[in-house]
Amino acid sequence: MPLSCPHFRKLLLLDEEAGPLEEELPRLADEGLNRRVAEDLNLQLPNVSIPWTHKVGNFTGLYSSTVPVFNPKWQTPSFPDIHLHQDIINKCEQFVGPLTVNEKRRLKLIIAARFYPNAPKYLPLDKGIKPYYPEHVVNHYFQTRHYLHILWKAGILYKRETTRSASFCGSPYSWEQELQHGAEPVCQQSLGILPRASVGSPVQSQLKQSRLGLQSQQRQLARSHQGRSGSIRARVHSTTRRSFRVELSGSGSNHNIASTSSSCRHQSAVRETAYSHLSTVERHSSSGHEVELYSIPPNSARSQSTGPILSCWWLQFRNSEPCSDYCLSHLVNLLEDWGPCTEHGEHHIRIPRTPARVTGGVFLVDKNPHNTTESRLVVDFSQFSRGSTRVSWPKFAVPNLQSLTNLLSSNLSWLSLDVSAAFYHLPLHPAAMPHLLVGSSGLSRYVARLSSTSRIIDHQHGTMQNLHDHCSRNLFVSLMLLYKTFGRKLHLYSHPIVLGFRKIPMGVGLSPFLLAQFTSSICSVVRRAFPHCLAFSYMDDLVLGAKSVQHLESIYTAVTNFLLSLGIHLNPNKTKRWGYSLNFMGYIIGSWGSLPQDHIVQKIKQCFRKLPVNRPIDWKVCQRIVGLLGFAAPFTQCGYPALMPLYACIQAKQAFTFSPTYKAFLRTQYLTLYPVARQRPGLCQVFADATPTGWGLAIGHQRMRGTFVAPLPIHTAELLAACFARSRSGANIIGTDNSVVLSPKYTSFPWLLGCAANWILRRTSFVYVPSALNPADDPSRGRLGLYRPLLRPWFRPTTGRTSLYAVSPSVPSHLPVRVHFASPLHVAWRPP
């Protein structure tokens, strides 16, 4: 007869009808009983030929691709002028007095952040924008390109101008001022940032001030001439609108106007008269930010031509005959002035050598499940988390549930602050730019790459004979619709661009570490500035707590002004006032303890409704199920041990079959959730100890002992002794000398025993007592006549490394008082 759910609960001692604990509980450690129960519940699944289930409700395998939904009406969010003050340490010290060593160390990490991977993998520009929406390729391209443009305008991205120069918008930092272009600034400026040069400045004078200089260019030219085939061109990059830098490129480029037969003559002309006043032909290359200067003798036929040769793919349609009713020339001829092919930033700096490549692709998704009107940029820098380019990210403290409850479970009134674009507050050093590159290859190459019928190949790109290969009804209709949204920016966005991050991106493992250090140090400063307030943060979630609503509002105003003075942007529309029950990190935290938020409880109920029985479920789907159930496991009777069969199947990468009894057991567990309470300090007067053959207790001055029917592993015996101590004394603070029992997870014990012990020892705190000082050591060895001196160890609840509470150093007396009315507390409130 299969084991029913009521019988199984009775076996686990979860009902009132259980017999004496000293007799019943050791049976649960028996290996044979655990094996028989597992077989009866079908928990040890042999290899079966039944097809696996790969989808349970909304849960799919971790590695299965869900179909993303594109919204053509996505709104690109606007970013404020985010500029975190560089002297943030001085500003904090003016506000609160001397900072602690830890606070200074954390703040120095982020001004400016460094990121130096070993060997990044560079990808072609074609992979800059991921084709996540095959039905909306062009629309997604322009929306993503517009998002990148907004980030660049907001000072969050650098724009690669040349191999060794970049431009950006916004306020410069001091380390950017030191990286000015060349030894001497082009214009006299105190900041040393290269401004836009005056119109009409000759190319010669600009080249003299180039960091490479004339001689180095000639040396490079002479060296590169040896062993190279094809033409060598003097390429002058536009670092500002009128200032140039000379570099050389070999024959591998795709835009070689000079024919092979004239390459020798062209090389000698460049070499002999590289910087003399010759007629030049300016031509924008496909990268959209380079100008190629071809030196041509004045008497040549080419110099007699009228006007420059148009290389802009977009503008070439103006001079071509329409190929059909859907030819792009109809669109291009709508405007006379399509604007520049490229834009330049307000400031220009030198950067390490940066290729015209990307290190990660980008695409757009909904901002969050509750906001589908706005888009969010997803950056895929996963190469830094896997393979040969993997980077070991620094670890940081994540608050566990008990520490969080100990710290925040109180009768305070709460509100939470929303930091606008929190990651984009933290600046990156320009030396990290070559490793964090995003961009696009331009519309023509992007469409050509995705079109299976396109005849465009690299060396033909942009020439007149294949110009109309792009023309199609779908492209024409898409561009006409986008023209209403972006106007003449369609031309700008159709050009290639390479961008590097100036602020930390979300797709790199270094970013959450830096953000956690930043917000935790800021909250530490706020806590010391306002002793009657509790400020706490995890990543970009900041919460403030105070005794009364009036006090909280006053502190909120002062803290907001302080954060704004540091350059931290808050979104006042998203400030939430929670009353006395704080919603934080998926929990509801009040004076009674912590519970999961309601939306998580609803997800669990939906999961059990759709959970199939007697059908093998893919272990990757089981990972998703365990992720949800594991979040709420501390609030159930049996906790994590109840999920151990699922953990075992995931570890073995085998399918798992839910038996009706096991599913009913889990469902009963999650129907009633018990709050995790705040631990209270107290005196430990109950001690437990065990040997493989017996157990002993010391309850005050009373001593007890007992023996096991058969020898048990020492950890199992120690756990049984702790359960007996809790059952006999009712004490919620127990002393033990076993480190495994001190752990709140009982997943390493026999399955049935772990489930029962989790319920018996719920809300029990443990104090470590060395064996030599443990009063229960003698009874466990059968010596009741010997009495050791009774210890009085004090239990102090831990808040882990997450509270980061620092006692305030002496504050200068001239600082004004922070709270100008009678404080609601007689003494400064401190975390427990």
From Swiss-Prot:
Spell out the residue ranges making up region: Polymerase/reverse transcriptase domain (RT). 336-679
One term of GO molecular function:
RNA-directed DNA polymerase activity
What ranges does the record list as Low complexity composition bias?
A: 208-224
Q: Where is this region: Spacer?
A: 178-335
Q: Which residues are Mg(2+)-binding?
A: D418, D540, D541
Reaction catalysis annotation = DNA(n) + a 2'-deoxyribonucleoside 5'-triphosphate = DNA(n+1) + diphosphate; Endonucleolytic cleavage to 5'-phosphomonoester
Chain segments carrying region Terminal protein domain (TP): 1-177
Site for Priming of reverse-transcription by covalently linking the first nucleotide of the (-)DNA, residues:
Y63
One of the GO BP terms on file? DNA replication
Q: Does the keyword Nucleotide-binding apply?
A: no
Q: Which InterPro entries match?
A: DNA/RNA_pol_sf (IPR043502), DNApol_viral_C (IPR001462), DNApol_viral_N (IPR000201), HBV_DPOL (IPR037531), Rev_trsase/Diguanyl_cyclase (IPR043128), RT_dom (IPR000477), Viral_Replic_Matur_Polypro (IPR051320)
Q: Name the protein family.
A: Belongs to the hepadnaviridae P protein family.
**Reported function:** Multifunctional enzyme that converts the viral RNA genome into dsDNA in viral cytoplasmic capsids. This enzyme displays a DNA polymerase activity that can copy either DNA or RNA templates, and a ribonuclease H (RNase H) activity that cleaves the RNA strand of RNA-DNA heteroduplexes in a partially processive 3'- to 5'-endonucleasic mode. Neo-synthesized pregenomic RNA (pgRNA) are encapsidated together with the P protein, and reverse-transcribed inside the nucleocapsid.
Q: Which PANTHER family match?
A: PEPTIDASE A2 DOMAIN-CONTAINING PROTEIN-RELATED, POL PROTEIN
**Which named protein is this?**
Protein P
Q: Which organism is it from?
A: Gibbon hepatitis B virus subtype ayw3q (isolate Hope)
